Amino acid sequence: MSKKETKKNRPLFTEFTLDMFSRSSGRSHSEIKQFNQWRDEIIEADKYTFETPHLTPQTPEISVRRIHGDEHQLVNFSSYNYLGYANHPEVIQAAKDALDTFGLGATGSPVLNGTFDIHKKLEDALTNFYGQKGYGVSLFSSGYGANVGVVSSYIHKGDYVVLDHSSHASLIDGAVMSQGTVKLFRHNDAEFLEKILKRISKENRRILVCVEGVYSTDGDYGNLKDLVAVSKKYGASILVDEAHSLLIAGKTGKGAVEEFDVLSEVDLVIGTFSKSFGGVGGCVYAKKELINYMNYYARSRMFSCALDPAVTGGILKALELAAGPDGDQKRKRIIENADYLRSLLKDKVNIGTSQSWVIPVIFGDERKSLPLGDHLMRLGFDFSIMMFPAVKKNQSIIRAFVTSEHTKEQLDGCAEALIQASKEFNFNI
């Protein structure tokens, strides 16, 4: 059999990748048909691990049902329930109490009739948590919506948004929606950023530099000290997205802005409730006059329903716990767990520049993604397999989220599974 014939008979999922279906074919809709054919072949080969329904809460050990009906007991490294608050009994009870008091949904825009007393309590609690006079908080129904709404309402046509090359999709989408001019700088490179700012600052336009506290695929900290200093030097405003660092980084959990002592110099801090808080939603912390403005001009807030009251009640309790001794203990434990897992993996697999509880294992070739995800699940572990467009082309990763709730035995098993897979799929060091 010729090489051409062999390739022709291979399953589509070993040859095609997601980017091949992202271009319009016009009225034929052929990319949609081809995508579904690609997906169907993955399912038929029993390699499909995406969208797998969970039968249990997001704890370190979970039960899932795969698409053909078989159930698996897995050690969970794919959830960002970093501090375990999604399942904490006090958080659950607080959510139940809010459900009984306020009902299931807010059923209205926060600007019109969707704001409840419990929303104001959460805004006040978050403002007090950060502790700066003259500041406030605005709530959003998702972290994605917070970034999109904040960036697109702060920046207008003729202004500039300057993004790190590793920026989350929500920051990119907010920048595009703003109609401002978008500039990109090399990841965490303050000198590269300075070259951009030096040139564009002469135009006397508003400039917003967007960075992250901890990067969601690389797992490294944002170079906040240097990036903030350069931004301020050229009169740029700076936004820090703390989605993966709020409640964890910093002595009291205020995030990377506390870890690197730049809170007072940052203009906008974005928080996400779906990770360390264990709920869903997002927020922005900024000067009160800016919060008042964004409440009306952030379209993702104005034209979305307000946060569910029950979820808001749970988030409020999670914040209370995280700001006290419980949070101190969990922060210590998650950092110890992450350090331990990195120590087991380094020199065995490529974990890039990870410094946090987000640990990527880089395997590169995205054609390995689907068989690799299936292989790891059959070993008894659930990871996030990330390929383009979530990461750069041919930079696919297995992403492990470490939590405060993982045991040493689970971390040992995680390292063993990843190292075994790296040999099986030929991406070991």
Write out the residue ranges for each language-model feature.
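Active-site phosphate-binding strand-loop segment of PLP-dependent enzymes
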Residues: 81, 183, 187-240
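Conserved N-terminal alpha-helix of the aminotransferase class I/II PLP-enzyme fold
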Residues: 92-141
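Conserved PLP-binding catalytic core of the aspartate aminotransferase-like
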Residues: 18, 330-339, 348-379, 390, ...
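PLP-dependent aminotransferase class I/II
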Residues: 276-343, 349-352
